[in-house]
């Protein structure tokens, strides 16, 4: 596979992919509600010649194998939006009030569709198998778990997974790719709850009560200091 030829073929898809991205951007959907997005992407893949499997509550998976043995690599793109009202004045502005693609998942899904098209062109050159995953509910941290439980990483068993995420508002030129070391491709977060129980008291004797608001504020400040003072930038 000649790199320059591959880039040329990718550039030739730009107009088509821009139309797809604008269409997806106009129809943002939340969490597992993929009534427009899922069939839209499924149809695009089927038009390329892929057999598409619905995995989990709203996910899509398809595979492509070459004529040479090799490992199975998963390429993953998320496709859900956020409950945010879009104020940008663009032709492809969200048509769904209170919803918008504010995190670039419309672009992620579009790029994976573009990759799927190029992989079909170069299928004979693929060593092993490439599995393509379109994941819902990334913003609520539920989509990946749902698809994994439904067998995403099996049949064939996945050896490694690759995801990508666009970024804005940083001093980087368009087209640059950042790859952190240590096998970690993207930072994430975890959710947890802390319950602070107070104790009521009379206004004349506050020393006998427990001020839960002040205690919670101190906890919040202490947790923030861990990130800003105890962990070096770039560490996880």
Predicted segments, located by residue:
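Histidine/acidic-residue-rich, glycine-tolerant segments that coordinate divalent metal ions
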Residues: 82, 90-100, 107, 124-236
């Amino acid at each position: 596979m000649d790199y320059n030829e591959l880039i040329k073929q990718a550039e030739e898809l730009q107009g088509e992919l821009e139309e797809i991205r604008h269409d997806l951007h106009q129809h943002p959907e939340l969490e597992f509600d993929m009534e427009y997005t899922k069939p839209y992407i499924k149809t695009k893949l089927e038009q390329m010649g892929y057999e598409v499997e619905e995995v989990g509550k709203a996910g899509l998976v398809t595979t492509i194998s070459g004529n040479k043995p090799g490992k199975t690599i998963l390429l993953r793109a998320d496709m859900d939006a956020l409950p945010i009202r879009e104020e940008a004045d663009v032709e492809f502005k969200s048509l769904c009030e209170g919803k918008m693609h504010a995190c670039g998942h419309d672009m992620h899904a579009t790029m994976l569709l573009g990759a799927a098209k190029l992989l079909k062109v170069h299928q004979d050159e693929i060593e092993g198998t490439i599995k393509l995953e379109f994941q819902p509910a990334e913003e609520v941290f539920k989509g990946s778990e749902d698809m994994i439980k439904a067998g995403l990483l099996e049949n064939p068993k996945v050896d490694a997974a690759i995801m990508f995420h666009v970024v804005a508002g940083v001093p980087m030129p368009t087209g640059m790719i950042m790859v952190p070391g240590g096998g970690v491709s993207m930072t994430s977060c975890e959710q947890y709850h802390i319950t602070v129980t107070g104790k009521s008291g009379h206004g004349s004797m506050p020393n006998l009560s427990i001020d839960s608001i002040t205690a919670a504020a101190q906890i919040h400040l202490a947790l923030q200091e861990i990130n800003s003072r105890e962990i070096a930038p770039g560490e996880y």
